[in-house]
């Protein structure tokens, strides 16, 4: 009986062993046939020691082919700890530390690790790497230390357009600005150096290295003009320092015909070749004592592109939107005499909103005069006639209710009340540019729309992508959207803006020989902060606009005050004076004409005025439908004593 049980147990064990063998064979077959490729790749990876070769990042050019960012040759130092003899590890670590000026303990830790490869340093200057090569040669070290080609980003103009261009990290990845936005185009494809090693990562005999070259990244052509950017940055820095602008400033110059950003400056800027070095001397002195969070916050603020990332109340510059909508809706016209009357304020929803010149009201005004005087009550009244629904449709069409989509990271959106929450008082304040916030790029785009015969054009910073291998250029076409206002309305608004510069609050932006239009603005930076934002928005030449400019200065505290006409307009004037000739925009033929002072026509009849103007080689422009030559003139544009060219038309209004 016991014998039979033993035989039975043996039989069962044999069956189990047979089943296990069958399962093992099935498993081996599955590994060989189904997973063979995978394990082969894993084995090859384990036996091959790969070192990366950085791709040369694409060049960034300005619109005229000037290099703004490029990749200079440098080298990367790596070590293979398993290929460095134990007795030489300390010597190697000390010498590398000495040559590369890196902490000895950190290098020793890497050299003594049980690993096949360790990165010691990237972007090493040729001078240092050649010194290391020479030492290796003199000490017969032919393995364990690798010196491979690498690239280092270099910015020839240092601080120029720093917040636009951006910068790269240690792995050549774009971290900010255009470098980040177009990283996929610029970065190229990495190469590699491969060598077969044993299980411990040591070289096997004289096996040759396998080299796969890196592929360069594509190049970019920006819309920025280096020379215009330099002019703009020069005057922005001067303005911020002279006017003691505690929170800096920004300037945008845009071509209204195609959306090209010719210049976009933020002050203060920073050195692109040292992007992690703070640009503030006070902060620099306490930098080492600051927390990591505080350091990061200050660096983020330094890198911030105010022109697209900051919002502000535009103030009176926004009256251009109200004027455009009013003209487009046929609510008013530019020169209807006595259409409006400023009494120093206006009652809205039980609240009296004052004109800035409440102490000496403007009195009888046309729309042109109201814009020249920057009279709040007139624009409040126009806003009431337009109505919330229609006004918000214009905000939408002008692009204020969404981001512009400009091709750079970090763009902020505007801050408006929801349409349903806008009451009479809220509409009133919107009408003259307060109690909401927009970005500078939205404002520049708005004026570009007006200057582009009323058609919206999207702002852009990149004109073309150039293939680094074939040099084929892929142009990026301008993007046009809706017709916001008619060409007729566009001409009227531009014409009124010219009056603002020739005789109104924007006089300080005037440049002899050029027809320039503009609008000044001043607003509080927040509620009851005691801080102000001052701005000037302008366009030239009026008859064929080639450039739109927006100057925005944050909290000027200097002796010049904080009014847009006194602080921001002069900056625009200096820039117009240099940029317009640079763009080959010739001065008006009138520059060669004789100049005369406008005579005083007030108190005279139209008939008498015609005679006086004829004697001075000037002409007269009457109110529409005016035929009575005996009427007395009560107001004239330009005012008396203003210098103009012969044949200029003088606008007159009667009582």
Where are these regions (language model features)?
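Conserved helix-loop functional segments at active or binding sites
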Residues: 238-242, 295-296, 499-502, 581, ...
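Beta-lactam-recognizing serine transpeptidase/beta-lactamase-like catalytic domain environment
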Residues: 67-69, 198-211, 257-317, 321-553
């Amino acid at each position: 009986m016991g014998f039979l049980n033993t035989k039975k147990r043996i039989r069962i064990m044999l069956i189990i062993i047979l089943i296990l063998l069958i399962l093992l064979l099935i498993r081996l077959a599955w590994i060989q046939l189904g997973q063979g490729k995978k394990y082969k790749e894993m084995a090859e990876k384990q036996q091959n020691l790969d070192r990366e070769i950085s791709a040369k990042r694409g060049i960034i050019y300005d619109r005229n082919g000037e290099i703004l960012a490029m990749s200079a040759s440098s080298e990367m130092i790596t070590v293979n700890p398993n290929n460095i003899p134990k007795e030489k590890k300390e010597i190697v670590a000390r010498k590398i530390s000495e040559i590369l000026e890196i902490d000895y303990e950190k290098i020793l830790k890497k050299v003594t690790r049980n690993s096949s490869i360790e990165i010691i340093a990237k972007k090493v200057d040729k001078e240092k790497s050649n010194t290391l090569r020479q030492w290796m040669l003199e000490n017969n070290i032919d393995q364990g230390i690798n010196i491979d080609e690498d690239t280092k980003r270099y910015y020839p103009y240092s601080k120029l357009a720093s917040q636009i261009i951006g910068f790269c990290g240690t792995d050549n990845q774009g971290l900010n600005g255009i470098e980040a936005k177009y990283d996929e185009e610029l970065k190229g494809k990495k190469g590699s150096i491969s060598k077969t090693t044993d299980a411990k990562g040591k070289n096997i005999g004289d096996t040759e290295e396998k080299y796969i070259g890196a592929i360069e990244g594509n190049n970019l052509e920006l819309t920025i003009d280096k020379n215009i950017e330099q002019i703009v940055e020069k005057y922005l820095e001067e303005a911020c320092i002279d006017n003691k602008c505690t929170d800096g400033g920004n300037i945008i110059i845009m071509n209204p015909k195609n959306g090209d950003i010719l210049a976009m400056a933020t002050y203060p800027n920073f050195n692109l070749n040292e992007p992690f070095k703070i640009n503030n001397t006070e902060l620099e002195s306490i930098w080492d004592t600051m927390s990591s969070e505080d350091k990061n916050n200050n660096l983020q603020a330094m890198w911030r592109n105010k022109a697209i990332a900051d919002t502000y109340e535009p103030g009176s510059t926004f009256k251009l939107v109200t004027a455009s909508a009013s003209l487009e809706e046929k609510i008013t016209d530019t020169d209807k005499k006595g259409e409006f009357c400023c009494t120093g304020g206006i009652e809205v929803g039980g609240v009296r909103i004052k004109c800035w010149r409440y102490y000496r009201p403007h009195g009888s005004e046309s729309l042109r005069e109201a814009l020249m005087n920057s009279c709040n009550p007139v624009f409040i009244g126009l806003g009431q006639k337009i109505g919330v629904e229609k006004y918000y449709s214009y905000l939408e069409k002008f692009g204020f209710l969404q981001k512009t989509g400009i091709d750079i990271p970090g763009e902020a959106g505007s801050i408006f009340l929801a349409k349903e929450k806008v009451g009479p008082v809220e509409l009133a304040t919107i009408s003259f540019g307060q109690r909401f916030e927009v970005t500078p790029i939205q404002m520049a785009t708005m004026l570009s729309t007006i200057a582009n015969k009323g058609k919206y054009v999207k702002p852009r910073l990149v004109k073309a992508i150039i293939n680094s291998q074939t040099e084929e250029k892929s142009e990026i076409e301008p993007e046009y959207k809706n017709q916001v206002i008619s060409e007729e309305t566009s001409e009227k608004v531009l014409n009124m803006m010219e009056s603002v510069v020739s005789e109104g609050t924007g006089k300080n932006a005037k440049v002899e020989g050029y027809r320039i239009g503009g609008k000044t603005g001043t607003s509080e930076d927040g509620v009851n902060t005691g801080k102000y934002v001052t701005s000037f928005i302008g366009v030239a030449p009026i008859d064929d606009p080639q450039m739109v400019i927006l100057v925005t200065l944050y909290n000027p505290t200097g002796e010049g005050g904080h009014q847009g006409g006194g602080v921001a307009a002069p900056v625009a004037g200096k820039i117009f004076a240099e940029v317009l000739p640079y763009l080959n925009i010739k001065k008006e033929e009138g520059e060669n004409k004789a100049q005369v002072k406008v005579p005083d026509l007030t108190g005279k009849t139209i008939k008498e005025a015609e005679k006086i103007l004829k004697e001075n080689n000037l002409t007269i422009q009457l109110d529409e439908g005016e035929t009575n030559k005996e009427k007395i003139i009560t107001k004239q544009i330009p005012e008396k004593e203003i210098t103009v060219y012969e044949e200029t038309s003088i606008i007159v209004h009667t009582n």
